[in-house]
């Protein structure tokens, strides 16, 4: 049995008993029931994920996966492909937005080369899972083979397992790859059936002509390859990206280990759709951090029945929204664990008429 098949088989339902116990405790903490809104529901969800009625999340990490995209040669991005490798080095040197926000919330940044089109120098904080020097240009040929698609997902599973084995108890997903909003829009259109124009945005800032070109390229690719919306590996192979597959694997791996995974923006959303087509049972393990400016993100939420925690108008990627989301998860669990109950505090409860 493959690592992918083994992992999918291990994803079970949430622990209803732990979730019920968490809800019961929330209901007797020194506050009106429901007064903390989503934070209460979030703590109950995490209790169900972990099987611990008072979960403590003390070792967060964000896995940032980077890869290049052959389709970027079609002029679909505002930035050249060499920016991918340059930004990976920026991550490793601690100078990117994700590094700042991860430091702020106390999370480790794990950087993974899934297919950057450059020979990156060895670095103790860089994990080399390179599948190739970027994907093929999916406007004329499949982005990768089906074998590569499975290998990309399994690389993500392995990265999640390694992090969890090292003590990580909550994961966030992040991405870097020039051209990856094009691949993500193609994935989202393929799986949701939405018109390409409805799920395609400006990415890193293409102008009107660039946006029109981007839409046309995706429409051409979908017409050429006709990916099967019910087969995540087929969609990934035909119009996806190595980092998108890797992130899908991180989500599956985390779910199989009963570890909450906070998904970032549009690229992570596309990866979540891939993960969900492979294993629908992954859905309750996913925590959507934020609503991206990218217009296709809403289609992801609709298909996966997810509600993001916040909307700050972000569209950077890298896992920036996800690490902020992790801090909310930690806060929610601290509320559940550390607040006193009415009985413990000697506070009178609600008057029952």
Curated annotation (Swiss-Prot):
EC class: transferase
Cystine bridges: none
InterPro entries: Nict_dMeBzImd_PRibTrfase (IPR003200), Nict_dMeBzImd_PRibTrfase_bact (IPR017846), Nict_dMeBzImd_PRibTrfase_N (IPR023195), Nict_dMeBzImd_PRibTrfase_sf (IPR036087)
Name of one Pfam family that matches: DBI_PRT
Domain of life from the UniProt record: Bacteria
Pathway note: Nucleoside biosynthesis; alpha-ribazole biosynthesis; alpha-ribazole from 5,6-dimethylbenzimidazole: step 1/2
GO molecular function: nicotinate-nucleotide-dimethylbenzimidazole phosphoribosyltransferase activity
Chemical reaction(s) catalysed: 5,6-dimethylbenzimidazole + nicotinate beta-D-ribonucleotide = alpha-ribazole 5'-phosphate + nicotinate + H(+)
Biological process annotations from GO: cobalamin biosynthetic process
Keyword field: Cobalamin biosynthesis, Glycosyltransferase, Transferase
Active site (catalytic residues): 318
SUPFAM superfamilies: Nicotinate mononucleotide:5,6-dimethylbenzimidazole phosphoribosyltransferase (CobT) (SSF52733)
EC number: 2.4.2.21
Function: Catalyzes the synthesis of alpha-ribazole-5'-phosphate from nicotinate mononucleotide (NAMN) and 5,6-dimethylbenzimidazole (DMB).
Family: Belongs to the CobT family.
Entry protein name: Nicotinate-nucleotide--dimethylbenzimidazole phosphoribosyltransferase
Species: Roseiflexus sp. (strain RS-1)
UniProt gene name: cobT
